[in-house]
């Protein structure tokens, strides 16, 4: 192997290492990890998630008119649906003998402090009729 080939191989390896270390910043959680001081947990997480999804929906072309007409009852139904979904998912995960990946909305936003982009990953897709 020539010196230039060796140098190119080392440079490529270093570049791959830098890309992996800078882009691999996903949150992970250990079992029993304590909540982050700026993390949002339980009802606060549900409220934050709902608010951020509504912001994301309005940014993607949804309107606030239908939401104002539906009123607070619709928000409570959405929250109850979200919480029941989380409860069902938790029960499935408890019954599963396989280890969990350690990444989810609770890991990213309660055990860690999540960004706007991270929490909106968990929002339902915006459709034309959802505005």
Swiss-Prot record:
Q: Indicate where the modification 4-carboxyglutamate is found in the sequence.
A: 118
Tell me one GO biological process term.
glucose metabolic process
**Which cysteines are disulphide-bonded?**
29-107, 41-110, 53-123, 109-114
- Annotated positions of the Serine amide modification: 130
Whether Secreted counts among this entry's keywords is yes
Under InterPro entries, the record lists:
Insulin-like, Insulin-like_sf, Insulin-rel_pep, Insulin_CS
Propeptide at which positions? 59-92
> What keywords does the record list, in alphabetical order?
Amidation, Carbohydrate metabolism, Cleavage on pair of basic residues, Disulfide bond, Gamma-carboxyglutamic acid, Glucose metabolism, Hormone, Secreted, Signal, Toxin
Annotated coiled-coil positions are none
Q: Which GO terms describe its molecular function?
A: hormone activity; toxin activity
Gene Ontology cellular component terms for the protein in this record? extracellular region
Signal peptide stretch: 1-24
Q: Where in the cell is it found?
A: Secreted
Domain of life, per lineage: Eukaryota
Secreted among keywords: yes
* CDD domains the UniProt entry points to: IlGF_insulin_bombyxin_like
Let me know which tissues express this protein, per UniProt.
Expressed by the venom gland.
Subunit composition and interactions: Heterodimer of A and B chains; disulfide-linked.
Name the job this protein performs: This venom insulin facilitates prey capture by rapidly inducing hypoglycemic shock. Intraperitoneal injection of this peptide into zebrafish lowers blood glucose with the same potency than human insulin. In vivo, when applied to water, this peptide reduces overall locomotor activity of zebrafish larvae, observed as a significant decrease in the percentage of time spent swimming and movement frequency.
So what family is this one in?
A: Belongs to the insulin family.
- What is this protein's name? Con-Ins Q1
């Amino acid at each position: 192997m020539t010196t230039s080939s060796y140098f190119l191989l080392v440079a490529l390896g270093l570049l791959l290492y830098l890309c992996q270390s800078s882009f691999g910043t996903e949150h992970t959680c250990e079992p029993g990890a304590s909540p982050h001081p700026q993390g949002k947990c339980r009802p606060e997480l549900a409220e934050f998630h709902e608010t951020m999804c509504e912001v994301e929906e309005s940014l993607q072309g949804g309107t606030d008119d239908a939401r104002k007409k539906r009123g607070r009852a619709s928000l409570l139904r959405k929250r109850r649906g979200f919480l029941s979904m989380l409860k069902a998912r938790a029960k499935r995960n408890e019954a599963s003998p396989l280890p969990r990946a350690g990444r989810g909305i609770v890991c990213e936003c309660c055990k860690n402090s999540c960004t706007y982009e991270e929490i909106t990953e968990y929002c339902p897709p915006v459709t034309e009729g959802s505005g």
